Amino acid sequence: MGSLKIVVLKRALHAIEKTTEWYQINLNLTAANHFKEGIYHTIEVLSRMPSIGRKDESMKGNHTYYSFLAHPKYRIVYRYTDSTLYIVAIRATMMSY
């Protein structure tokens, strides 16, 4: 199987940009680049093997959604068809108190 076409929805793209910006402001440019490169590398892997994620029961709708840990603190939420991988959201996995 080849790679699926990748579509990053606006909501997910915004989350990637805002999180990268946070890393740059609060840590440094190296950390920001490492985060962003890690997310996009994981998206590339998912485009070749979309079934490696687990079903994400928190997402409701007409589609089956999956999530995959892309970074120690973030999951990629996605769905896919025979030809396209849709990146739906980037979700923080940190526990809130």
Regions found by a protein language model. Name each.
Residues G2, T64, S83-Y86:
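Residue-level signal for beta-strand positions within conserved beta-sheet cores that form or flank
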Residues M1-G38:
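Arg/Lys-rich, positively charged N-terminal/basic patches that mediate binding to nucleic acids
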Residues K5-K10, T20-E21, Y40, M49-D56, ...:
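Alpha-helical transmembrane segments and membrane-interface helix-loop junctions
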Residues A70-R75, R79-Y97:
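Enriched for short, Lys/Arg-rich terminal
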Residues V7, P50, Y66, T81-S83:
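Generic alpha-helical hydrophobic packing signal
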